[in-house]
Regions:
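Conserved ATP-binding TGD loop and adjacent catalytic N/P-domain core of P-type ATPases
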Residues: 396, 422, 428-572, 580
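Bilayer-spanning, highly hydrophobic alpha-helical transmembrane segments
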Residues: 12-16, 227-257, 272-290, 571-600
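Flexible metal-binding regulatory segments at protein termini and peripheral loops
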Residues: 1-31, 38, 101, 110, ...
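Conserved catalytic phosphorylation-site environment of P-type ATPases
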Residues: 68, 168, 268, 278-354, ...
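P-type ATPase nucleotide-binding
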Residues: 334, 338-460, 469, 481-497
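Juxtamembrane helix-loop transition segments at the membrane interface in multi-pass membrane proteins
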Residues: 52-60, 99-109, 288-307, 614-622
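Actuator/coupling domain of P-type ATPases
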Residues: 19-122, 135-142, 149, 160, ...
């Protein structure tokens, strides 16, 4: 609890004790009434002040105004105990709401407790000095001792250790790191001493981007939140005017009919109507539900950029995957080399050198298989041809390395290969030199992930890939993916997603899942863009609506289940709050419901709705 909450709790306790004493002990009226007024002012003075300021600033219609009018009116009718009770229970509800929101924020802060407080930097004498991470420049060597957080992204230059990435990924399995491995901020060093050369400033590091993402998520409102905001703006003035009509019209009608006006009875009913009508339960619990849902998701390594995306994900019926790095490991290995008119080693050397400037996983596998240091001085005029391959001049000869489309582009006859895998054809000075077969492994949970998506209510799964049809069909068959589209260029993937979007129902959403490396256009075109394996990937965090911090495809169904649970809670609160209020408003208007029922309809409903909203935090076992 903060100071404000503690102070309010003391006021509530004092007011409650005094209220109970006054109700239990039979006191003369001339003592009882002043005591009730003292308790009323002690617990409600701030509400009265807020209502007065609202009137002065011409922002009349809010819950403070409703409570002030209702309780002052009750005092005017000499219902001192009910006026005090309404104000007391309203303040109890407000305190509980404040505490619940604060508690959920604290939980989320603890779950996302990844911000490092300091970085260790060696001074000129070799002594460690703790400095603010913001002060550390790129290229600085920082020292991370066991038990400390990695402060800034970088590369290990000395030492080996295991890192706990649970706060980022939701997974407890530690990650082994040693010299030349990349590490990201927010991880906890568990065993050995590490010296890390920073590759980013703190403001651009992974931990900063994640914290910004989580903190700014509340600024992107869902349709449900926007509806509640609009509803409250119309609803509050409407019930105020309805209460005024309830107070004036029946007595006037009675007078016209020659009956007693009975203004006191109708004023009491109008005041009861006002207390019941307070929209706190909706205004508070709906944003809290989304806030808790986003916080619970972040604990599981699912970062949602706004409640609008969480709401959209709950209506997701189609999931489209990129193959490489999403359903497969993206760790390619050379499975075979078929040479034509040059030695096998020379074919691999030419292919590796031509691809040496590319960051594509296939290029990395060729470099790994080649195993030697690349002499970049031998390579000239490198040109990457999107969706086809690479053209380069190596040792004065022109080398083409890529798929069959590249061979067709340059009218080079090539040998068909029926091996399962990605085929890299190589041509030297316009003559076919052979091809290299590269295979990719499925991710361990890929098949389970597709099954889990079907159980989560996904109608259709689709896989898009630039790979050849034989490889794509084999992967889709193994994983039981419904549809597969192969041999696609990057622009073809965007067109295919647009085609799929045009075929779906307007109330159904389509999610695209990619590894965030080359998928930015498709991620932004889908209803929901999901980047997975984003640990350390700036591009993924920027491009996607939802970011999965590790490589486990099972997290996709987890994210959908979290979204559905959150939206289910939101609608529970909407139906419950509106339903109870409508019934009580009707009972209040006809005189059956009194102030005590009104207190339940306001404070009781709010507390129940807030408690229900907090359930959205609990997503671990989904």
């Amino acid at each position: 609890m903060n100071k404000k909450q503690k102070k309010m709790l003391k006021r509530i306790i004092v007011a409650s004790i005094l209220f109970i004493i006054i109700k239990v002990v039979k006191l003369p009226e001339y003592i009882e009434i002043p005591l009730f007024l003292v308790v009323y002012l002690e617990i409600g003075y701030d509400i009265l002040l807020k209502a007065f300021k609202g009137i002065r600033n011409r922002q009349v219609f809010d819950e403070n105004f409703l409570m002030a009018v209702a309780t002052v009116g009750a005092i005017g009718l000499k219902s001192f105990d009910e006026a005090t009770a309404v104000m007391l229970f309203y303040q109890i509800g407000e305190w509980f709401q404040s505490y619940a929101v604060g508690k959920s924020r604290k939980n989320i802060t603890e779950l996302m407790d990844i911000r490092p407080d300091y970085a260790n930097v060696e001074d000129e004498d070799g002594n460690l000095e703790q400095v603010d991470p913001d002060e550390v420049e790129i290229g600085t060597i920082i020292v991370v001792k066991p038990g400390e957080k990695v402060a800034i992204d970088g590369i290990v230059v000395e030492g080996s250790s295991t890192l706990n990435t649970a706060a980022l990924t939701g997974e407890s399995l530690p990650r082994e790191v040693s010299e030349n491995d990349e590490v990201i901020s927010g991880c906890i060093n568990m065993t050995g001493l590490l010296k890390i050369k920073t590759t980013k400033e703190f403001g651009e590091s992974t931990v900063s981007k994640i914290l910004d993402l989580v903190e700014n998520a509340s600024s992107k409102k869902s349709r449900s939140e926007a509806f509640i905001s609009r509803f409250a703006r119309i609803y509050t003035p409407a019930v105020c005017y309805s209460a005024l009509a309830l107070f004036l019209l029946p007595p006037v009608f009675n007078l016209i009919m020659g009956n007693p006006a009975d203004f006191g009875t109708w004023l009491y009913r109008a005041l009861t109507f006002l207390v019941i009508s307070c929209p706190c339960a909706l205004v508070i619990s709906i944003p809290l539900s989304f806030f808790a849902g986003i916080g619970g998701a972040s604990n599981q390594g699912v970062l949602v950029k706004g409640s609008n995306y969480l709401e959209a994900l709950a209506s997701c019926k189609y999931v489209v995957f990129d193959k490489t790095g999403t359903m497969t490991q993206g760790v390619f290995e050379v499975a075979g080399i078929h040479h034509a008119n040059i030695p096998e080693e020379k074919l691999l050397e030419y292919a590796a050198m031509a691809e040496s400037y590319s960051t594509h996983p296939i290029s990395k596998s060729l470099l790994k298989a080649y195993g030697n240091t690349i002499d970049k001085s031998r390579i000239e005029n490198v040109e990457e041809i999107s969706g086809h391959g690479v053209k380069a001049v190596i040792d004065g000869v022109q080398v083409l390395a890529g798929n069959d489309k590249l061979m067709k582009m340059y009218n080079i006859p090539y040998q068909e290969c029926h091996s399962i895998g990605t085929i890299v054809h190589v041509a030297i000075d316009g003559k076919y030199a052979g091809h290299i077969v590269i295979s990719d492994m499925l991710k361990p949970h890929a098949k389970e992930a597709i099954e889990a998506l079907k159980k989560a209510g996904i109608k259709q799964t689709v896989m898009l890939t630039g790979d050849v049809k034989s490889v794509a069909d084999k992967v889709a068959s193994e994983l039981h993916i419904d549809k597969v589209y192969s041999e696609l260029l990057p622009q073809d993937k965007v067109n295919k997603v647009e085609e799929l979007l045009s075929l779906k129902h307007s109330k159904e959403n389509l999610a695209f899942v990619g590894d965030g490396i080359n998928d930015a256009p498709v991620l932004s075109r889908a209803d929901i863009g999901i980047a997975m394996g984003a640990l350390g990937s700036d591009a993924a965090i920027e491009a996607a609506d939802i970011v999965l911090m590790d490589d486990d495809p099972l997290k996709i169904s987890k994210a959908i289940k979290i979204a559905k649970k959150c939206i289910h809670i939101v609608y529970e609160n909407i139906y419950f709050a509106i339903g109870v209020k409508l019934i009580c408003l009707l009972l209040g208007a006809i005189g059956i419901a009194n102030m005590w029922v009104a207190i339940f309809a306001d404070v009781g409903v709010m507390i129940i709705a807030v408690l229900n909203a907090i359930r959205a935090l609990n997503v671990k076992n989904l």
